[in-house]
Amino acid sequence: MKISVIISNYNYARYLSRAINSVLAQTHSDIEIVIVDDGSTDNSRDVITQLQEQAPDKIKPIFQANQGQGGAFNAGFAAATGEVVAFLDADDVWKPHKLQRIVEVFQTSDVVGVMHHLDIIDGNDKTIDQASTQGPKLSEDLASVILQTGNAWCFPPTSGLAYRREVLEKVFPIDPVKWRIWADGCIIYCTAFLGKIKTLQENLAYYRIHGANNHMSAASATSEQEAKSQAGIEMTNQYINDFLVRIGYGARVDLSRNLQYRRTKYYQRSQWDLREVWGISRLILGWPFYSGQERAYYLARFLFKSGKFLLRSDVHTESTTI
């Protein structure tokens, strides 16, 4: 089974050799590497050219003007010839048996995609306190998960994704303007409605956090980053529903079911709203990714914070009636 590996690169020359060599070192050797340099201004072209000279039968370089991740994915997919297409960020690294493991799944099941999580490393390849991208255990019916949670994010990043080519042909090309970043989300959400997706409970790669990538945690997000994230969720939701119309899928994704989105919107308004408090509380109590203990904890925390909005509202009301 031939695997096409698409690597989108923009100014990651310092990490690129590690990424590409981790593919060349795979125990599954029937591969091609389509490396799309998206208008880099560092020495990425030199790095790619040198590596391609060392493995000309494996590496297909594409150099293009900057279009963002979506445009790079489009170019990479158009050049890919494998039965399965796997994605790798230019700053991440695969473990040697990663492709062999996903090939086993594709050859022994009818799933259209395979995902897995990643260990987390820093810019110097040091593992960060045994951290990983592990999330909730997901069923193969990702479409139901997405519909139930209003497209809440609970998936591995780019370097943990692989799909059968014939399925991606129904998704690509993607809109390069809307998906300049987070294009992996477009792929995950769209393919979920085209067949079963297997999520392996194994960390088969390393996800690098180094300050220059788009990694953002809820704890460290600024108000500007939160607003950008919320806008991204809204765009994603519209894109998914447009895609569902195109493929003739009956259901639509309802953003009001997305706990993360809805709770953040409420916090941003900072105003007491009984109807919204009730709605969000119900979402917390039924959230499929929380344990019973977590539901109790997050409900208490939400109500405590909402109570502050209520007190603030009461104070404001009194001050305006004096």
UniProtKB/Swiss-Prot annotation:
Signal peptide residue numbers: none
Disulfide bond positions: none
Organism encoding this protein: Nostoc sp. (strain PCC 7120 / SAG 25.82 / UTEX 2576)
GO biological process terms held by the UniProt record: biosynthetic process
Organism classification: Bacteria, Bacillati, Cyanobacteriota, Cyanophyceae, Nostocales
GO molecular function annotation: hexosyltransferase activity
UniProt keyword terms in alphabetical order: Glycosyltransferase, Transferase
Pfam hit, one: Glycos_transf_2
Highest taxon of the lineage: Bacteria
Coiled coil: none
Protein family membership: Belongs to the glycosyltransferase 2 family.
Name of the protein this chain belongs to: Uncharacterized glycosyltransferase alr2836
EC number(s) from the headed UniProt entry: 2.4.-.-
